[in-house]
């Protein structure tokens, strides 16, 4: 048998890895989520100077670049009307000749800040029934919160718990006890953290005064005209 040869061309590809170093975390509306990591090959060697795709819940939002040592940083602004709860931020390398594509994700949980108000309070006296009222809303212009728990404190002592209505208004009736001293007092309304809503609070003041009365005393039952 005479000798013979043959040849076959083939491509050698290597896997890639998008390694996100940012841990899952919480973020508020209007803040900016930062996602950091590295692009490496299958054995952890850096793959520098490539482009990656950044996405939120599967929707591409921008591209970011890998620097010369394989690191990347992606910034995701959270809109003021972002739906509350978990979102998935993805980083994807689309691959190229001889390098396979890869992707990775990290979860951020979106929260809303909460603002609470207390309506102006007039002076009251011991034994009077005082109405404490106000509003509660999130960061949106018409983001009034329904069925949101409000805790009311006087001088740091809890005096009652109430809940907001559909239009964000809340109120609490409180009878001023005899133990309250005459003078100025602080009052606070706190909306504890609830669901994906942060804690919100506000402070105000009111005055407790004495009840006064005027009594008239007439010395005689008769009066003389011109006398």
Residue map of PLM features:
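Enriched for extracellular/lumenal, surface-exposed ectodomains of secreted and cell-surface proteins
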Residues: 1-4, 56, 78, 86-104, ...
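Short flexible loop/turn segments that cap and initiate beta-strands
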Residues: 3-6, 40-60, 87, 104, ...
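Interdomain boundary/hinge segments at the C-termini of tandem beta-sandwich modules
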Residues: 9-14, 106-112, 206-210
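Proline-enriched interdomain boundary motifs that mark the N-terminal boundary
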Residues: 15-22, 112-120, 211-218
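Beta-strand-rich structural segments
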Residues: 28-43, 74, 91, 127-141, ...
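Surface-exposed loops/turns
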Residues: 29, 48, 68, 83-84, ...
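Aromatic sugar-binding surface patches on proteins
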Residues: 68-75, 166-173
